[in-house]
Structure formats: structure tokens, C-alpha cells
Amino acid sequence: IDSTKLSLFDNASTQYVNFVNSFGTSYSTLRGDASWARDTLDSRTSPTRGIVQSAYGEMGLPGGTLHYYKINYQHQWYHPLARDYTLRLNGEIGIANGLANDPLPFFKNYYAGGISSVRGFKSGTLGPKDSNGEAIGGGRRLVGNAEKYFPMPGLGQDKSIRLSAFKDIGTIVASND
């Protein structure tokens, strides 16, 4: 059971205020979780070949005050391009929504942007914004990355430090869009 207590600031987003006005500030969520992972990488620290897959599901079950679901899937693929060059492709998708006519709790929203998803953006800044211009996240997340790893000049065969060129894409969409 997850227990959550919220406090809102004076300039809180309308989305947050509306949620608190409808559902109050204290929640007890009976949460069910399930996950699965598969890893065939040839190295933990500097992979050149293999895949990593993971899936995760979370649900606010009947018996709690919040009813929702979240489903995430990630697939990473490493492939050697040449002796010292590796291609990494990564795709992530997340879908979340409220259940039983409840909205998705705003604190369960997805976020993207930043070093772990879409580099070049500040952390968590992609997607819908509130009336103050602040990111509020959403119920849909899509992220894709392509990276080419190559050796650091002067280090020879040491793969513990590599350089990379990358391209990232991603978006966050509100639950009701």
C-alpha cells in the first residue's frame, strides 16, 4: 500500500489544484507491480553486442483511493560496426491512464528530457506545460536514441572510456490527447 499526502504551493498548476479539489490531499493506493527483463550484452561496462529488454507494469488496484495503470517497455540493441565501433539503438514507450473514470494522478505522469532520455533539453522539460510554463508531464512517453561509440584517441584498446555521437528524439503527450 502506497500512502501519499500532497501539499500545494500558492502558484500550483491548475491541473494540480483541480486534482486536489476532486480527490483531496491524502491517498492510499493498493498498488500491483510486475516486471520482466532480458539481457544478452557481452559486457556490463562497455557492451558491443547484444540486447537489453525490459517491461514494467504498475496498477492502482480496487481497494485503494486511486485507480490507474502504467505500462513501460524499453529495448536496447548493441551491434559492432567495425572492430572499435559500436552502434546502440534504444527505444522506450510508456502508456498510462486513469481507470474507473478516474484521471491519471498527476504525480504518476511521465517526463522526458535530459541526459537520460533526450539530451539537449533540461531534465523533464519535454511535453505539456501548465499556465506558468512549467512541465507537467503526461500519460504517453516515447523516446528514441541512436549512438555510435568509438575509441578515445590515445587510449588504445581501453574501452572503459569511449566517445559517442548521438541523435535523440522524444515526446510526452497528455493522457487525454
Q: Language-model features: where?
A:
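C-terminal outer-membrane beta-barrel translocator/porin domains of Gram-negative envelope proteins
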Residues: 2-161, 165-169, 173-176
